[in-house]
Amino acid sequence: MIIWMTGCTNGLGRALVPEFVERGHTVVGCGRNEIELQRLSEEFPDCFFMACDVSDEGSVEDFVNEALISAGEPDFLINNAAIVNEPAPLWQVSAEEFNSLTSVNINGVANMIRHVVPLMLSNDSGMVINLSSGWGRSSSPDVAPYCATKWAIEGLNQALSQELPENVGTVALNPGVINTEMLQKCWGEEADSFPSAESWATTAAPFILGLTPKDNGKPLTAP
């Protein structure tokens, strides 16, 4: 299968790449860290990696066009790219930082869907995986902007599921609590007590690959 994934240069996305490849799939990935993208290209020469800012629709359009030429149409789209705010009460979060989160975490998902789902509709086949969060189903102090964006993804996913035909599906996937740079930013050393992204990916990858349009609309949590 051909798996398109955003945010592949670090965290959960970076950890999923080798797991998918080892299972015989082609990864088409994007991110903003060009050094890591080059490393990925060298490590996985049969895959395709390209710089892309998902919050910029023009950048997304360029990525989609190049990916189609280099790798082919997607069986899966994994909307993984996301950022978190510096922990602070909402009234101390600047408008610039708040807008940055919504641009990446919400607009970025919508931009990818806008350009990729029509390909799936044409093929009458495909799965969209929108990475959510436990903070998209609950809340916590000092991360209100992040919570807001992930609650938005849950609603977006539910509405999208009602718009798709029978053979195309979408799910909102809560990865669980994983020791990534984002969690360290929020929790500091406490994050070290949780599983690494690499450990998580060994069970998350087969779980994701097992999702089908029969799961359409479900709010799921990775094992």
At which residue positions do the language-model features occur?
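Conserved glycine-rich Rossmann-like NAD(P)H-binding loop of the short-chain dehydrogenase/reductase
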Residues: R23-R39
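Substrate-binding pocket helix/loop in short-chain dehydrogenase/reductase
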Residues: A88-L90, E97-N99
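The beta1-alpha1 cofactor-binding region of Rossmann-like NAD(H)/NADP(H)-dependent oxidoreductases
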Residues: A51-D62, A95
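C-terminal helical subdomain
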Residues: E166-V168, A172-L173, T180, E189-P223
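Conserved glycine-rich cofactor-binding loop
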Residues: T9-N10
